[in-house]
């Protein structure tokens, strides 16, 4: 089973009705090596861990349950929504508290409770008023723009303090993202669900970042297909990662459905074909990159 460096298990199961027991069991049966459940709110870590723990408790096969516990990991971070931006100081205090509570949790037997990454966090200037996040350009006055950068930079600083990689969300905001990274001077982590071109990829890679591709790479029509394949070939083997961002961005042929980590195989199939390798070879490459990045 192919590793998935970015998904939202609680959103997928409790908000979208996915059978989490079936998903985790399938991942375990296919010998998944790594799955990273991603945080988006300062205080969501404990709830997300509890959601996974409840699901594991429902697995009848003890060996299967142990496998799930061995491949599941967690990040903690604050996605740049407007409310969080305007309450940066309190949000950061809450995030730190939740991370440190996990660090000192004594129950290490059934789940990796220690956070292995900060995020997702970053910059989002994709205006989508009718979408789930109701993101409006009118909400982003000068103070909000500054606050968004402040919130991102604070999490980069926290990651440096904790010696953890960062899961970066960057959409329609390359310049601001790069400015924040340069301001802090911390270059360890993933540019998740990568959506820019080769020039931007080069800028991230030159600073040491990994780049993760999701189901969106399978969406492009013929006019843009070669550019996407060129990008997939451009990213070097030792910086390449694959993800789903489940429950979002289900890959073709499942586009429009609720995504799950099981579907990451379609990302590997598409990316490996573009790169001239096999899905199995790419899977091995990604697993080695995961071990290196997260020091596993």
Predicted regions and their residues:
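Mid-domain alpha/beta scaffold segments of enzyme catalytic cores
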Residues: 1-296
């Amino acid at each position: 089973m192919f590793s998935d460096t970015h998904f939202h298990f609680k959103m997928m199961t409790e908000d979208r009705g996915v059978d989490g027991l079936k998903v985790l069991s399938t991942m375990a049966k296919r010998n998944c090596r790594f799955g990273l459940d991603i945080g988006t709110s300062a205080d969501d870590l404990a709830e997300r861990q509890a959601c996974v723990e409840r699901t594991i408790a429902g697995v009848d096969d003890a060996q299967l349950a142990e496998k799930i516990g061995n491949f599941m990991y967690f990040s903690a971070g604050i996605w740049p929504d407007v409310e969080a931006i305007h309450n940066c100081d309190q949000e950061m205090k809450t995030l730190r508290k939740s991370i440190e509570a996990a660090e000192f949790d004594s129950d290490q037997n059934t789940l990796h409770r220690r956070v292995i990454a900060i995020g997702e966090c970053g910059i989002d200037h994709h205006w989508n008023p009718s979408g789930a996040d109701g993101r409006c350009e009118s909400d982003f006055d000068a103070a909000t723009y500054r606050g968004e950068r402040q919130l991102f930079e604070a999490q980069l600083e926290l990651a440096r303090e904790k010696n953890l990689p960062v899961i970066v969300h960057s959409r329609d905001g390359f310049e601001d993202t790069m400015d924040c990274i340069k301001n802090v001077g911390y270059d360890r982590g993933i540019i998740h669900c990568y959506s820019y071109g080769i020039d931007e990829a080069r800028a991230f890679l030159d600073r040491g970042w990994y780049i993760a591709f999701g189901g969106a790479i399978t969406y492009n029509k013929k006019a843009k297909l070669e550019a996407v394949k060129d990008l997939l070939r451009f990213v070097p083997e030792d910086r390449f990662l694959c993800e789903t961002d489940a429950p979002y961005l289900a890959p073709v042929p499942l586009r429009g459905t609720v995504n799950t980590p099981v579907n990451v195989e379609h990302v590997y199939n598409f990316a490996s074909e573009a790169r001239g390798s096999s899905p199995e070879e790419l899977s091995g490459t990604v697993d080695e990159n995961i071990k290196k990045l997260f020091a596993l």
